[in-house]
Every structure is written in structure tokens, then in C-alpha cells.
Amino acid sequence: MKTDITLETWLGEQEADVKGSSLKTYKSYERVHIRPFLGHLYLAEITAKKQRAFKKQLCESLADKTVRDILSYLRTLLKRAKQKGYTVCIKTPKTAVEWREKEVPDFQEHKALSEKLRYSQKPVDMGILLAMSTGLRLGEVLGLRVKDVDLRASVLHVRANRQRIYDPKTNTYPVREQTPKTQKSCRSIPLHPALKNALAHYLKNMGNPDKEKPLIANRQGRAYDARTLQRRFQAVKKELGLRPGVTFHSLRHSFATRALELGASIHTLSELLGHSSVAFTLNTYGHSVTEQKRLEMEKIAKCF
């Protein structure tokens, strides 16, 4: 068995055969999380104990799904190494992690955000409002164009995803716009009255913009970078005194949680979020469904 190789070296030998957006994600996992914590170790030294410590560190600051994805990617890397004849520990820790409510804005935080942003005419504020009101991913918010807002039909069309994609030829992350990963990510979301009204005022303030213009654009008409919206969200979060664990992506979870609390079906929620399957939605938000069932049973109990 081969033993004289570190994870850092092994990562450098990998040839990615995945879509650009996924490649960007994997490279980010390597650079930000895997290399700093495990990269210096030989493959045989990455024991189950070391992996559990790695998982514990990830859980301190990342969303549950991100932790699962990073651990799953690490497991894939180790399995590939074993297939090549290297000595590795394949007893990786379970990828399931506990749901942490601290990551999701509660009702009062959600309401405070809405009241703060609803009447703002700043594009970055509209981007945040859209994320929390529709469950859109950050890249989907930035991929919206003026033509995607249909006020007559009260519908928002999601057709593109804008994000930085890793380019292995230049080792850079240029911003690119592409269609979403799956067909179900291309979707139409009904606009509730409050959001429709906010969008109508926002578009009016833009002054009859070109239909192809990015909806969330700067004064030069170019779409904002994701980091700009994230910085703005951090500023708003600090101003409103939201909990430290709340992130921009938490807005998507907040939308889903509020929807389930108000009686939305898991199937409808799955379509609104653009998930690949209802099973994935149930696996992600099953805790909220269980809590909703408990509340319904308490109502039924009053009949006995």
C-alpha cells in the first residue's frame, strides 16, 4: 500500500469532471476548509478521530447542508485515494448534523428585516427583501432581470444563476451567468401583495429600465457582486441586532420555516425553493413539519 502522500498533494492530483458551478464549490471547500485543517496530514493520518474534530469545527460556523456537503466531498476524496492504492481511513463520520435554530431568523427578526427593507429603494436592499420573501438563493437573486418581474400576472420568473465560477485554466473566479443546475430550479414564484407593491415602486424608481437590465444593478447598470449584498446584509443585521448565527443564506431557511408554520405543503415548498426533489425538502425541513404536526395534534386534542 502507498503511504507517502499528503492530502494536499492528493488534492493537487485530482481532475474535476463536474459542472463549473460545482467545481467552484469544491475548490472553495478545499481552499477554505479542507486544506487548512487536514492538508498537511498524510492520508493514513486522517483518522476517524481527526475527521470528527474536523466536523466539529465545521459545525461551529457553517450551515448544516454545507457541513454535509464538505464531509461528503472529503469522503469521496478518500475513497478515490483508496482505489488508487493509498492507505486511508474510510470510516468517515456521519454527515448528518443537528438542525440549529439559531441560524434561522425567528418571527420577530423576520418581521424587523421586512419592515426595514420594504420601503427602501436601494437595489441591495431589494435583493435582501427578495431572498427573504421568496426563498431565492443569492445567485438566483443576482441572476434576475427586469423582464423576470411580471407585475400583471403577479409572478417572478427564475431563469438564471449568477455567481463566481472557478476557471482551472486561469485559476481565477470570474463572474458568470448560467442556467440553474437542475430543471426544477427554473421556476415561477407567485408574488404576494406586499412584495408586488415593493417591486412596483422599485421599478418605477428605476425609470422605465431596459427589460434585459439586471434587476439588482448598480448605477452603471451592472449586476452587483454577491459579496456586496452579503456585506449589506451584515450591516443591516448589526443595525437590527440580529443573532450572530444568522447569515444571508439563513433568509432562505427563514422563508421555508415561515411557509411551513403557515400551513404550506412540503410539495409546494419544494417547488418554490427549486429543490431537486420533495425528499430533499423533507430531509432539510422535516423538523418544522414534525413541529407543525404536533401543533395540529394539540388542536385536535381539544375535541376529546
Question: Model-flagged regions — what are they?
Answer:
Residues 33, 41-56, 60-93, 137-139:
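N-terminal DNA-binding recognition helix of tyrosine site-specific recombinases/integrases
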Residues 116, 168-172, 262, 283, ...:
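DNA/chromatin major-groove-contacting recognition/catalytic segments
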Residues 1-49, 202-207, 211, 290:
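N-terminal DNA-binding module of tyrosine recombinases/phage integrases
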Residues 64, 68, 83-144, 152, ...:
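Basic, Lys/Arg- and aromatic-enriched nucleic-acid-binding interface segment
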Residues 192-243:
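Active-site/catalytic core of tyrosine-dependent DNA strand-transfer enzymes
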Residues 5, 17, 162, 273-298:
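Catalytic-site neighborhood detector that most strongly recognizes the C-terminal catalytic loop/helix
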Residues 107, 143-201:
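Conserved tyrosine-mediated DNA breakage-rejoining catalytic core shared by Y-recombinases
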